[in-house]
Every structure is written in structure tokens, then in C-alpha cells.
Amino acid sequence: MIHIVLHEPEIPFNTGAIARTCVATGSALHIIKPYGFVISDKMIRRAGMDYWPKVDLHEYVDFADFLSQHPELDTGRALTGRGETHGTKPKLWYATTKAHQTYSDVTFGPDDYIMFGKESAGIPEEILTEHEENCIRIPMWGEIRSLNLSNSVAIILYEALRQNGFEALSQTGDLHRLHWRDEAALHLPKRD
């Protein structure tokens, strides 16, 4: 299971949308305090809709609390080179607009954690400089500061899931009123 970590999120609509994405992908959501809202806000529930009770939610007092509760993580302190794996330990990736490597440069493991910072400032620079080799970014045109947080989470999360074969996610869907045409006649690969 991929884990999404939000460091001090500020906007409830973003957190609600991210929570819904986590439910849709079978990913866990870890939130590091303080928040810029109350977790039971109507706005979060509205953005997360009826999925909020299904969120695999974990909360932490601060980043140190998060690290102490996850000693199994490879946080990137031991530099082994760009995009290399560190044995079998799940990695903690840090999404930032400042990183040298992109999210597509690295190999995500099936149990990795991907951390995103608050909307106004990102992940604190003290954390980024300590873990530079695990920092990743989404390429953007230079005229914009950053993408929306929930969009950034979705982009990187789905790349991590793609690299792991979309494990445990449905590969096809049913139409509401009609049926799909015969896949054999269309020369499409069979779906599971």
C-alpha cells in the first residue's frame, strides 16, 4: 500500500480531495499537525463526500512524531545515488518544486510513503536539505510557483501505483446502461 503524508495541510478542500483519492486507490493518508482547519469541518466532508469514514487516516503531532512511529522507513539519510533502492525498507519521498530529480526518475516501492508540504510553503527546507536524495518534483513551466496540492498528490500517487502494476486496483469498469463490445472482436488484450 502506498502512503500519502501531508505535512501541515492548510486547505480543507485539498485534504478532502486527497482523502477521496486515497480511498479510491487503497492508499493510507497520514497527516502531520498542525492543520489549518478542524479535521471534522463540513468542507472536508463535502470534498471527501461519503468516502471520509473509509479513509485509512493516521495523525501525528509533528514530523518527529511521524518519524518515531515509522522507524522502518528509509528517510533518505544514507546517500546511495539518484533513484537507487535502499534494500527492502519502504522509502519516504519528499515532493517539492525544488528537487533535482523528477518523480518519474525514481523507482517507487509498493509500500513507499510520499510526503507533501503545506500549500503556502511546502515541506520545510530543514527537512528537505536533510533528505535531498529522496526529494522529487513534478516538472512545470517556469512561470508558475506550484500545482494544486491535490493535483500533485494524484500525479505522483498514480505514477507510484503504475510502477507497481496498479496492484489491487480494478482494471476495468462496467457501464451504467450499456455493455462493452466484444473485446476479442476489437483485438484488445483481455482484461482480468
Question: Where is each model-derived feature located?
Answer:
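Post-transcriptional modification and biogenesis factors for structured RNAs
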Residues: 1-192
